[in-house]
Amino acid sequence: MESLGLVDGPGIRAVVFMQGCRLRCKYCHNPDTWALTGGETIAPAALVEQLKRFLPYYVRSGGGVTFSGGEPLLQPEFLAEALRLCKEAGISTCLDTAGVGNGEYADILRYTDLVLYDVKHYTPEGYLEITGQPMTETLRFVDAVRSANVPMWVRHVVVPGITDSETHIRGLARYVRTLPRVERVELLGYHLLGVEKYHTMGLTYSLEGVPALSEERRCACQQLMDECMKGEQCK
């Protein structure tokens, strides 16, 4: 658990990293979270007792707790109960997810104030190429978010030569505009911080040799995205 995160939702936030993920994204920087095993075992009530210690910081900054991963949706019973207890304690809740769980989303979203939705790609073909999995489950999750009427911040990783073209950004914007209650779109630059983990774990890193995205290029992509989200240059 990261106690005072500043980039995983509004305000000062505790970030709870949960084990397990079915996706094998080419740019994943946390391969150590793929397996459901490992990490620290803790009960929802015990976790929320730890989170309560930072309640004054959450309140003053407009923050709260963000459940991330891995993919937190793969532990639905734990997640729903932890979110419920957070809400009872007056802690604002946020879910950082790619939307690929077991289809059990209603109880989770009932206690979620904000979804940070990681859009891997906007076409089935591109999604399969990036993640190794079909797009079906994440679309089910989007439908559940729509039904629950939970606001959403969209995030998307921009990789040089893969997802940084103007055509891609415009297509992404068209897709994002179909999503429910999108309040913000953040383009994240591809980085190399997780590459060493692959070497340590004896895994092949499929983007070996691809450079990190420059901040200048990321800003240019973000500017185009912002214009498209306003209805400009989106064709």
Where are these regions (language model features)?
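Canonical Radical SAM [4Fe-4S] cluster-binding loop centered on the CxxxCxxC motif
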Residues: L6-I42
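Conserved alpha-helical substructure of the radical SAM core
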Residues: P31-S61, V65
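Conserved AdoMet/S-adenosylmethionine-binding subsite of the radical SAM
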Residues: K52-G64, S68-G69, L73-L193, H199-T200
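Short secondary-structure capping/turn segments at boundaries of alpha-helices and beta-strands
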Residues: M1-L4, R13, F54
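Short glycine-enriched, charge-decorated loop/helix-capping segments at active-site entrances
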Residues: D32-L36, L128-P134, G202-V210
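Auxiliary Fe-S-binding modules of radical SAM enzymes
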Residues: M1-G5, P160-K235
